[in-house]
């Protein structure tokens, strides 16, 4: 009933912070916006505003606001939940919440204590305290209804004791996001094979982790395999799984080299195992080790929309089809994808009557607004609705004359408006101060062309300080040394490292590629 109003309120508070015209209220806007997003089930956007709230929070906040902010930080950001000692009632509420998330017990007591606390705040008759205590009550009720202590045992049909150790750990989710509730409601945590459609940024990685944990805890599988079509994605998934499971589970990422660099001896380990590889590697393995599939109890295929990829989609599709024909219906197979136009057809083809389609159009990625700033001082906002969108070219590029080389007569400029790579470099230099930027090339050879152009611009005196200045100098020096050991000190890749620019493509040596991805992920480099 109130969902549309909550969405409007959250967008208003979000925009109010961006307007920068009432800075003294920004902390209230941020916390109110985070709460509005939270109550409308947009936990990703709530997390963003909550993080910004803690960067700007004022220690002089009232107690209900303080408790609410700390509780949201605890739920969304895995921050410590600090006990408020401003009033006895507030302290009791905090302690009861912390006790619940440590044991899974005492939900009824929380509601009773919260009611008493709300009554005491109303008696004080302080408007802002009343405003925040009402929102706090709503947030606590929603959080308890989506609590992992309640939903994971229910969805997996496993006793709470099998989840207890995990839920007491700091890495466990305190509540399930809509995406995780979706896979639970569809029976995926009970072993149901499924086609799962989830947009980016809604907790897909955590969903994969929960599926694997439920499969291991129930005894349905001791080995899970995750197949992802990109080597970089395999690296990212492997890091996430190692972080999530630690040394309790053996996480093994196969190389993408098509050779017999694996052994079935890895299945002799008593630990549960998570294997990660590309489709090409798995296809190679099962053609050389026919018994390999006998050891797998859970198959997870990521990025299912890659079926439509012209060069690799057929390999991926044939691999999944071959595996489906070799395994029994008891073994669980999950296909994850952000976008599948024919999801129902794929479900019938791949899973038949044994599987389900898990999809919910209400689960949306974090909304974004794109605006083009122009020399006319107007801002043109991009619309996803093609019926409302007009053709628009922003007049925001300033062309600059470059220094001439010795004996060079022709004046050269940057950017050349007919050169796509110049436009890309120009905007990357302008935008990288706001976060990492990537220039996408359609061929590997273009990577070197772009880097040579950046080096040429530096040599002609063009200011590229934004790229270098916003990168981590020490990390870039280390990467330059590593690049030098592969290519030599005078190679453009090595020189580019000193300018804050790194190459990345499939044939880059694996050690370099991993180092580049690590630097990009940890915000040490601003342009790839």
What are the residue ranges of the model-derived segments?
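N-terminal helicase ATP-binding lobe
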Residues: 1-528
């Amino acid at each position: 009933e109130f969902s549309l109003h909550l969405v409007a309120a959250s967008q208003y508070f979000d925009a109010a912070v961006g307007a920068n015209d009432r800075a003294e209220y920004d902390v209230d806007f941020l916390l109110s916006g985070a709460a509005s997003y939270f109550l409308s089930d947009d936990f990703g956007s709530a997390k963003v505003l909550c993080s910004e709230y803690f960067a700007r929070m004022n220690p002089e906040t009232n107690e209900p606001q303080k408790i609410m902010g700390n509780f949201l930080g605890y739920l969304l950001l895995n921050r410590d939940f600090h006990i408020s000692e401003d009033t006895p009632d507030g302290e009791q509420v905090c302690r009861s919440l912390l006790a619940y998330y440590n044991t899974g017990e005492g939900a009824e007591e929380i509601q009773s204590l919260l009611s008493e606390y709300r009554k005491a705040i109303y008696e004080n008759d302080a408007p802002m305290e009343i405003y925040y205590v009402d929102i706090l009550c709503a947030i606590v009720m929603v959080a308890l209804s989506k609590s992992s202590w309640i939903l994971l045992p229910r969805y997996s049909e496993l006793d709470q004791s099998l989840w207890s150790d995990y839920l007491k750990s700091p890495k466990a989710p305190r509540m399930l996001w809509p995406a995780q509730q979706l896979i639970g409601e569809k029976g995926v945590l009970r072993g149901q094979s499924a086609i799962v459609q989830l947009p980016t940024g809604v907790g897909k990685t955590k969903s994969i982790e929960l599926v694997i944990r439920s499969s291991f805890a129930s005894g349905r599988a001791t080995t899970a395999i995750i197949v992802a079509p990109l080597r970089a994605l395999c690296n990212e998934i492997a890091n996430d799984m190692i972080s999530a499971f630690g040394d309790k589970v053996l996480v093994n990422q196969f190389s993408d080299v098509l050779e017999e660099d694996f052994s079935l001896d890895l299945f002799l380990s008593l630990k549960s195992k998570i294997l990660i590889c590309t489709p090409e590697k798995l296809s190679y393995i099962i053609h050389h080790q026919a018994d390999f599939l006998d050891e797998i109890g859970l198959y997870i295929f990521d990025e299912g929309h890659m079926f439509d990829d012209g060069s690799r989609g057929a390999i991926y599709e044939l691999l999944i089809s071959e595996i489906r024909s070799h395994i029994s219906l008891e073994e669980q197979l999950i296909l994850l994808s952000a976008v599948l136009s024919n999801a129902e057809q794929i479900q019938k083809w791949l899973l038949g009557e044994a599987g389900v389609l898990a999809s919910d159009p209400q689960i949306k990625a974090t909304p974004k607004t794109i605006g083009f700033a122009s020399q006319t001082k107007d801002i043109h906002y991009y619309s996803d609705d093609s019926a409302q969108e007009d053709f628009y070219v922003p007049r925001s590029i300033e062309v600059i004359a470059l220094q001439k080389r010795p004996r060079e007569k022709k004046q050269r400029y940057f950017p050349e408006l007919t050169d796509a790579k110049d436009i890309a470099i120009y905007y990357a230099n302008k935008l990288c101060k706001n976060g990492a930027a990537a220039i996408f090339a359609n061929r590997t050879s273009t990577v070197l062309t772009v880097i040579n152009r950046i080096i040429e611009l530096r040599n002609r005196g063009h200011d590229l300080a934004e790229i270098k200045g916003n990168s981590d100098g020490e990390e870039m020096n280390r990467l330059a040394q590593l690049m030098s050991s592969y290519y030599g000190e005078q190679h453009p890749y090595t020189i580019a490292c000193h300018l804050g620019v790194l190459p990345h493509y499939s044939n880059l040596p694996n050690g370099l590629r991993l180092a580049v991805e690590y630097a990009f992920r940890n915000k040490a480099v601003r342009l790839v």
